[in-house]
Each structure stands twice: as structure tokens, then as C-alpha cells.
A protein has these predicted regions:
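Conserved active-site-proximal phosphate/metal-binding subdomains
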Residues: 154-185, 191-332
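Active-site entrance/lid segments in N-terminal catalytic domains of soluble metabolic enzymes
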Residues: 1-179, 315
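Residue-level detector of alpha-helix initiation sites
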Residues: 26, 190-191
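Short, surface-exposed recognition loops or helix-turn segments adjacent to catalytic cores
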Residues: 133, 187-188
Length: 332
């Protein structure tokens, strides 16, 4: 049995159990389709899309691929501080049902996905603790993404305050694998085939890579952001509420450190974005990476500029090389 013939791959309907993580604001239909056409699972980070925008994006992906792809939404309740900040989740879910999305994933909780599953979608939830993974399995998901502390972007924690959960993937993944019977996909700091092989060795059936695809040709990542990623060492990120009001891992730029150093509590999610987005936009316009609020994981320095299909091909080859070097038989 080949290393990629895992329960996760079968559940997701893909050749390779590699997920392009759904990074809201950076994923495009072109990126999702290119990854899926290469045999992995492309995705749309759709949390901030209106129902009409979501429908258009799904149809754009379908114009480019017949392969499975994933749509991701945020499952947290509308925040009291800004009740109309997000598009209504129930309206977004209605689009997911109507468009018969092949794979549906969610973050920050457990929505009512019964209609989505009845429409034929494979359901994927995000966990940062064993307790969350068990709750997801009890709710009926088909697979669990185990998000380690190394991961870029918002922490997916939903059963405890995110600041209390700092479990790295090396510790989290095998515990989640032991705790649930559904396939587990490892996430957090995975950038190349070595990381994928490590995830498989921990018992995961696949790996989710986000930061690694931010520099794909098809990603909506601006030049200043791309340069910043390549220059960010492993210690060059931090988890903070300074970006949005909710814990997220981002690069330690001057703009980030200035806000952290000011010592003022961030505004509640998502009102803090009213503070950071104008600074970020100005940094992009000035082509100044030091002014960006760049969500990224601890493996950012390992990014590579390439078309998404080439990245998938390289990841597969690297995984096979890593497994071969260890003399490991994944079917054993």
C-alpha cells in the first residue's frame, strides 16, 4: 500500500491526503482548483464571503476542476460587539447545501451541519484539544483536523479560552489519533515532505498546509507579504489578540510589536480589525512588509514560490523521499 492510501484520502475522495488549508482572504478559485487537479484537496476560505460571493466562488472552482474541493466557514456565534460583522452562517450554509459542495469544513465550534451532510458533503472539523476532537466525532464529522500550536492564523479553539491552549502538533496529533475513530489530519508548521512524513508517523492520515501555499502563484498574497514570509525565522511569529481581538499567530512585524508594546487591550473581535486593517492596507500600498499584519505559521521561512500544482508534486516527492530515508513501510 502506498503512503498516500490512507483513510483520510478515501474519506476526502482524493489521491493524496494533502489539504491546502482554507486561508480566508488568500485562497482563490484558481488556487483551490489547481491543488485539486494535482490530486490533493484545494479549498476556499469563505468565512467573509456573502452568500452571493460564496456561490460565485464555488461555481468558479467548478469551472476549473471536476475534482473534490473544500469550503470552510467560521462556526462561532456572531460577536456581541459587532453582530453584523460576518455574513450570516445559516445563509452561507444554505449556499453550501444548494451548490452540493463536496467537502465542508468549519473552525471555531460545531455548527448544525445536518443538511450539508445530507446533501452528500464530507464533513471536516477543527480541533486544538483532545476534548474538542471527541466533541467533533460525537457530532458526526467524517474527519478531524488537529491544529497544533505552530499553525498560522486564528486558533481554532472552541471549548476553552484560546489563550489556555498551547499544545504543539507533536503532542496533539497522536493523542487525537488515539481518542477518535475518524481519520485525523495534522496541521501546524507543516511545510514540506519531511513534515508530512512526520505527521503520518504520528498516526495522522494526512496533513493540512496553509502557509506553504501562501506563496503559490495562484494565491491572493501580495508581493510584500510574500517577501516577509521568506524572511521570517521560526521565532519570528507570535500568538496575540492584537490583529483581530481573537488569538491568532502572525509575524512579529514592527506594526504588530508597536501595538503589543502599547499595552492597551485589543478591542473585542472583530472590532480590532478596524484598527489593524488600515495599517495593513497602507503597508501593502507602500510595499512595506514592516507595516503588515501577516498571519503565518512557525515554518514560514520554508515557503517556496511556485505554481500550486508544482508545489503538490514537490510535496509528494519529498514525502516519498523522507519515508524511504527512514526505511519505513507505511502499510506495516
Amino acid at each position: 500500500m502506498a503512503w498516500y492510501e490512507t483513510p483520510a484520502a478515501r474519506a476526502l475522495g482524493v489521491r493524496y491526503p494533502l489539504l491546502q488549508a482554507p486561508m480566508s482572504g488568500f485562497t482563490t478559485p484558481e488556487l483551490a482548483a489547481a491543488v485539486s487537479n494535482a490530486g490533493a484537496l484545494g479549498s476556499l476560505g469563505a468565512a467573509w464571503l456573502s452568500p452571493d460571493e460564496l456561490r460565485a466562488a464555488i461555481r468558479a472552482v467548478r469551472q476549473l476542476t471536476d475534482a473534490p474541493f473544500m469550503v470552510n466557514l467560521f462556526a462561532w456565534p456572531q460577536p456581541d460587539a459587532a453582530p453584523d460583522a460576518h455574513p450570516a452562517l445559516d445563509e452561507q450554509l444554505a449556499v453550501v447545501v444548494e451548490e452540493r459542495v463536496p467537502v465542508f469544513s468549519f473552525t471555531f465550534g460545531i455548527p448544525d451541519f445536518a443538511e450539508v451532510k445530507s446533501a452528500g458533503a464530507t464533513i471536516v472539523g477543527t480541533a486544538t484539544t483532545v476534548a474538542e476532537a471527541r466533541a467533533l466525532e460525537a457530532a458526526g464529522v467524517d474527519a478531524v483536523v488537529a491544529q497544533g500550536w505552530e499553525a498560522g492564523g486564528h486558533r481554532g479553539t472552541f471549548e476553552r479560552p484560546p489563550a489556555e491552549v498551547e499544545v504543539g502538533g507533536l503532542a496533539l496529533v497522536p493523542q487525537v489519533v488515539d481518542a477518535v475513530s475518524v481519520p485525523v489530519v495534522a496541521a501546524g508548521g507543516i511545510m514540506d515532505g519531511r513534515g508530512i512524513a512526520a505527521a503520518l508517523a504520528l498516526g495522522a492520515g494526512g496533513a493540512s498546509l496553509g502557509t506553504a501555499f501562501l506563496t503559490a502563484s495562484e494565491a491572493a498574497t501580495q508581493p510584500a507579504f510574500r517577501r516577509l514570509l521568506a524572511q521570517t525565522p521560526a521565532e519570528g511569529t507570535r500568538v496575540s489578540r492584537v490583529y483581530s481581538g481573537r488569538e491568532a499567530r502572525l509575524v512579529r512585524t514592527d506594526a504588530v510589536e508597536e501595538l503589543v508594546g502599547a499595552g492597551r487591550p485589543p478591542a473585542p473581535y472583530p472590532l480590532q480589525l478596524d484598527v489593524t486593517r488600515p495599517i495593513h492596507r497602507a503597508g501593502l500600498q507602500a510595499d512595506d512588509p514592516s507595516r503588515l499584519f501577516a498571519l503565518a505559521g512557525q515554518g514560514a521561512a520554508l515557503v517556496r514560490e511556485a505554481p500550486a500544482a508544482d508545489l503538490v508534486e514537490t510535496l509528494v516527492a519529498e514525502t516519498e523521499k523522507a519515508i524511504s530515508r527512514l526505511g519505513w513501510d507505511p502499510s506495516g
